[in-house]
């Protein structure tokens, strides 16, 4: 079969899995009490703006995990260790988000794992992902695809492996948290992920990395499942992906960038995620240093809500920005 056949099959698995499993999943989540309680510390205005979202089922992102496992089992050779590496990675990152949503559900105050504990677990999981890739890729792990510049290789020294390991770990953890920050409006994170995954898929299909095929299948599955999820997550949302979905999606996108040796390309392919994270970093840094806020509220999408833009307008504009970033990213790959 041609690689395109695998891509179409993976996309179809993700799409139909989300479309047909989501309805019974929403009913089950309601029965289990997985509901968004819209508790925002020191953000009374934000609670007021989002009061209509209270008690909407959350943790719907578990469908992305199921779809990804199914796609890997159906399309990857079962005897290869890389197949089980993918399944283990998918399940562990899915479990992290699920546990976080479980804790939120039990406490019913909008808080799950503490930021420190979550960050520590994320780094451990990311390291567990990067190390096998580093040993499998060997010298290839020292090469990076820099936008507009092409392939750049580091010298074969121990510090090169350490630097490459740090960059790869940062890409996975950073993207995971960035998608999590972006998941604050109906259809925003899922819509941006569809665009980002399709953009990275174009890169993966033309990439010569050892495990590029794995990326093609995963990215196509995620794009399809996010597209199907949008039917239920677009405004007015009937379900949220929760941390189960956002942490998982970001980690998978980051892992694919690592596999393609294209971590720096995430600056374009995940452009809107980068902007959301930067807005939080700038906001927190400014307040700690100057006791002044740069934005009315962070992440960035809430800033525009505070300025009076409707939720649909913010989502539409952000998705346009993400599309532009992805187009620039694709151009950056092929012009070098």
From Swiss-Prot:
Q: Which GO terms describe its cellular component?
A: plasma membrane
Q: What class of enzyme is it?
A: transferase
Signal sequence, start to end: none
Membrane topology reported for the UniProt record: Multi-pass membrane protein
- Which reaction does this chain catalyze? UDP-N-acetyl-alpha-D-muramoyl-L-alanyl-gamma-D-glutamyl-meso-2,6-diaminopimeloyl-D-alanyl-D-alanine + di-trans,octa-cis-undecaprenyl phosphate = di-trans,octa-cis-undecaprenyl diphospho-N-acetyl-alpha-D-muramoyl-L-alanyl-D-glutamyl-meso-2,6-diaminopimeloyl-D-alanyl-D-alanine + UMP
Q: Which InterPro entries match?
A: Glycosyl_transferase_4, PNAcMuramoyl-5peptid_Trfase, PNAcMuramoyl-5peptid_Trfase_CS
One Pfam family matching this protein: Glycos_transf_4
**Compartments in which it is found:** Cell inner membrane
Q: Where are the transmembrane segments?
A: 1-21, 56-76, 78-98, 124-144, 148-168, 184-204, 210-230, 239-259, 264-284, 314-334
Spell out the molecular function terms from Gene Ontology.
Answer: metal ion binding; phospho-N-acetylmuramoyl-pentapeptide-transferase activity; phosphotransferase activity, for other substituted phosphate groups; UDP-N-acetylmuramoyl-L-alanyl-D-glutamyl-meso-2,6-diaminopimelyl-D-alanyl-D-alanine:undecaprenyl-phosphate transferase activity
Needed co-factor(s): Mg(2+)
Gene Ontology BP annotations: cell division; cell wall macromolecule biosynthetic process; cell wall organization; peptidoglycan biosynthetic process; regulation of cell shape
EC number(s) from the headed UniProt entry: 2.7.8.13
> Which pathway?
Cell wall biogenesis; peptidoglycan biosynthesis
Q: Which UniProt keywords apply?
A: Cell cycle, Cell division, Cell inner membrane, Cell membrane, Cell shape, Cell wall biogenesis/degradation, Magnesium, Membrane, Metal-binding, Peptidoglycan synthesis, Transferase, Transmembrane, Transmembrane helix
Q: Which family does the similarity line name?
A: Belongs to the glycosyltransferase 4 family. MraY subfamily.
The record's annotation in PANTHER family points to:
PHOSPHO-N-ACETYLMURAMOYL-PENTAPEPTIDE-TRANSFERASE, PHOSPHO-N-ACETYLMURAMOYL-PENTAPEPTIDE-TRANSFERASE HOMOLOG
Job of this protein = Catalyzes the initial step of the lipid cycle reactions in the biosynthesis of the cell wall peptidoglycan: transfers peptidoglycan precursor phospho-MurNAc-pentapeptide from UDP-MurNAc-pentapeptide onto the lipid carrier undecaprenyl phosphate, yielding undecaprenyl-pyrophosphoryl-MurNAc-pentapeptide, known as lipid I.
Name under which the protein is recorded: Phospho-N-acetylmuramoyl-pentapeptide-transferase
Name its species. Answer: Chlamydia trachomatis serovar D (strain ATCC VR-885 / DSM 19411 / UW-3/Cx)
């Amino acid at each position: 079969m041609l690689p395109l056949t695998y891509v179409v099959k993976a996309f179809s698995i993700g799409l139909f899995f989300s479309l047909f499993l989501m309805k019974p999943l929403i009913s089950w989540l309601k029965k289990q009490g997985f509901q968004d309680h819209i508790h925002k510390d020191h953000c009374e205005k934000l609670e007021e703006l989002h009061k209509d979202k209270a008690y909407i089922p959350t943790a719907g992102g578990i469908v992305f995990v199921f779809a990804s496992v199914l796609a890997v089992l159906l399309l990857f050779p079962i005897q290869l260790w890389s197949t089980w590496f993918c399944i283990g990675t998918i399940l562990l990152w899915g479990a992290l988000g699920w546990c976080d949503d479980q804790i939120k559900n039990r406490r019913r105050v909008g808080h799950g794992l503490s930021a420190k504990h979550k960050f520590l677990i994320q780094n451990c999981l990311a390291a567990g992902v990067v190390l096998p890739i580093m040993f499998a890729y060997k010298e290839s792990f020292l090469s990076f695809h820099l936008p507009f510049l092409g392939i750049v290789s580091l010298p074969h020294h121990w510090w090169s492996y350490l630097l490459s390991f740090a960059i790869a770990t940062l890409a996975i953890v950073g993207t995971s948290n960035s998608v999590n920050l972006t998941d604050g409006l109906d259809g925003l994170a899922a819509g941006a992920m569809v665009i980002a995954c399709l953009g990275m898929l174009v890169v993966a299909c033309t990439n010569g990395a050892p495990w590029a095929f794995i990326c093609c299948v995963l990215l196509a599955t995620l794009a399809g499942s996010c597209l199907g999820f949008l039917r239920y997550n677009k405004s007015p949302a009937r379900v949220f992906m929760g941390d189960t979905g956002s942490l998982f999606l970001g980690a998978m996108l980051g892992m694919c960038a690592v596999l393609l040796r294209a971590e720096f390309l995430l600056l374009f392919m995940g452009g809107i995620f980068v902007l959301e994270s930067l807005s939080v970093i700038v906001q927190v840094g400014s307040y700690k240093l100057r006791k002044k806020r740069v934005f009315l509220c962070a992440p960035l999408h809430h800033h525009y809500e505070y300025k009076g833009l409707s939720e649909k307008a913010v989502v539409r504009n952000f998705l346009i920005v993400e599309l532009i970033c992805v187009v620039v990213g694709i151009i950056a790959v092929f012009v070098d």
